[in-house]
Amino acid sequence: MNPNLNIEQDNASEIIAGVDEAGRGPLAGPVVAAAVVVNQSIMIDDIKDSKVLSKSKRESCYDKITNNYYYSIGIASVQEIDKYNILEATKLACIRAVKNLAIIPTKVLVDGNMNFTDNRFISIVRGDQICYSIASASIVAKVTRDRMMQILHQEYPVYGWNQNCGYGTKLHIEAIKTYGQTIHHRVSFKFKGNINHSAILGNMV
């Protein structure tokens, strides 16, 4: 099933923002959330959960979404992930994304099953698969975070972030064992194997 506008159309009197995140699982980098308020008169082809789209298709959809819809980004840093835990940091990123919108939504549809104190927020399990607004947000969040990791890769190339985007691939884990963790690694995330915990600062070659 492709995402559709059924929920948005059933709540036609509301200003609805779809929200999704990227980066809950990686060993490095922030968690990034996006909020999107769609213009229902402009439907973009190929809007789906970002995970099922190719990189080129995500980039194409990203350009169309950001040129035609209200959107914003919210970020929770590695330090916040380690301080609060990944769930609370993800919620923080989602809240920030909504606050950063140029338009104030009256209802916020969030992918997943998180609980929020703001009663505008409604969590929808697998929302990125059924809700057009959430799927749009998933694309914006994914492309934004991937681009951030590309930039960080230039400073720390041995970890392969241009390919793994901070996820725990074999290359990434071996690099951590060899070179240690950077300031962009989540020290609260554990995995098997011995690690050199000394932080690596500055450029790496």
Swiss-Prot record:
Pfam families: RNase_HII (PF01351). Its EC number is 3.1.26.4. InterPro entries: RNase_HII, RNase_HII/HIII, RNase_HII/HIII_dom, RNaseH-like_sf, RNaseH_sf. GO terms for cellular component: cytoplasm; ribonuclease H2 complex. The keyword Manganese applies. It comes from the Bacteria. Endonuclease that specifically degrades the RNA of RNA-DNA hybrids. A divalent metal cation binds at D20, E21, D111. Manganese or magnesium. Binds 1 divalent metal ion per monomer in the absence of substrate. May bind a second metal ion after substrate binding. One of its GO terms (biological process) is mismatch repair. It is found in: Cytoplasm. It comes from Orientia tsutsugamushi (strain Ikeda) (Rickettsia tsutsugamushi). This is Ribonuclease HII. Belongs to the RNase HII family. Gene3D superfamilies: Ribonuclease H-like superfamily/Ribonuclease H. Residues 14-201 form the RNase H type-2 domain. The keyword Cytoplasm applies. Keywords: Cytoplasm, Endonuclease, Hydrolase, Manganese, Metal-binding, Nuclease. It catalyses: Endonucleolytic cleavage to 5'-phosphomonoester. One of its GO terms (molecular function) is RNA binding. Its cofactor is Mn(2+); Mg(2+).
